C-alpha cells in the first residue's frame, strides 16, 4: 500500500451563507484544492439526517441524506427557488458556529418553497422513488408522522398502532399524509441528486 495524505473535515464545516456547509460550490472548491495540494483522501462525517442533539452519529435513518446539506444556490440554478425566496432569511447570528435550531426553522421553510415548484411527474424523481422504495417509503412516512407529533421520539407518539407499525395504521397515515410524504421524498431526491453529481 502506497503512502498518502488526506484531510478529515465535515461537509457542515464548509463556508456557506446559509448557516451550514453544503454540497455546493464550496465543496467543489475544497475538493479541487485538495487535489491541487496532493491530498488523496477527504474523510467526512456521516451525512445522515441528524436528530435531537444534531450529532452526525445519531441519525433518523441509515440511508437518508441530511437536508441541511442540500445546496440552496443549486436549487436557484435549477429553477426551484428564486433569490427572493432566500432574501431576509435568518441562518444564525454567529458565522463561525452552526445554529441548528435556527437552521431547522428556516431551511425546511425554504425547501417547502422549492417543493411547491417541483414537478412531481419528473421522470428522474419517479425513478428515484421506485428504485429506493425499500427504505424511502418508510422514511418519508416516519418523518411525516413524526412532524405531526411535534417531532417527538416515536416512543412518545400518541397512536400506539403506528408506533407498532400495524398495517392498518400504516395504510391510514400513508393516505392521510400523502402530500407530506411526497415532500420528504422530494427532499431525499434533491440530496441524492446533488450528492451523486458531487461524487462524479
Roles of regions detected by a PLM:
Residues 2-200:
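Acidic/aromatic-lined carbohydrate-recognition and catalytic surfaces
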Amino acid at each position: 500500500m502506497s503512502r498518502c495524505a488526506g484531510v478529515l473535515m465535515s461537509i457542515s464545516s464548509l463556508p456557506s451563507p446559509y448557516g451550514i456547509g453544503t454540497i455546493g460550490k464550496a465543496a467543489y472548491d475544497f475538493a479541487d484544492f485538495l487535489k491541487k495540494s496532493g491530498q488523496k483522501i477527504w474523510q467526512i462525517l456521516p451525512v445522515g439526517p441528524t436528530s435531537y442533539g444534531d450529532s452526525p452519529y445519531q441519525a433518523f435513518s441509515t440511508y437518508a441524506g441530511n437536508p441541511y446539506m442540500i445546496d440552496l444556490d443549486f436549487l436557484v440554478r435549477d429553477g426551484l427557488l428564486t433569490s427572493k425566496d432566500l432574501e431576509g432569511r435568518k441562518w444564525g447570528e454567529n458565522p463561525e458556529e452552526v445554529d441548528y435550531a435556527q437552521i431547522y426553522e428556516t431551511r425546511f421553510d425554504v425547501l417547502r418553497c422549492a417543493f411547491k415548484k417541483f414537478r412531481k411527474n419528473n421522470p428522474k424523481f419517479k425513478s428515484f422513488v421506485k428504485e429506493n422504495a425499500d427504505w424511502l417509503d418508510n422514511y418519508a412516512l416516519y418523518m411525516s408522522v413524526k412532524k405531526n407529533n411535534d417531532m417527538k421520539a416515536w416512543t412518545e407518539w400518541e397512536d400506539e398502532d403506528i408506533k407498532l407499525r400495524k398495517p392498518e395504521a400504516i395504510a391510514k397515515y400513508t393516505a392521510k399524509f400523502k402530500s407530506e410524504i411526497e415532500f420528504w421524498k422530494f427532499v431525499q431526491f434533491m440530496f441524492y441528486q446533488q450528492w451523486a453529481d458531487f461524487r462524479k
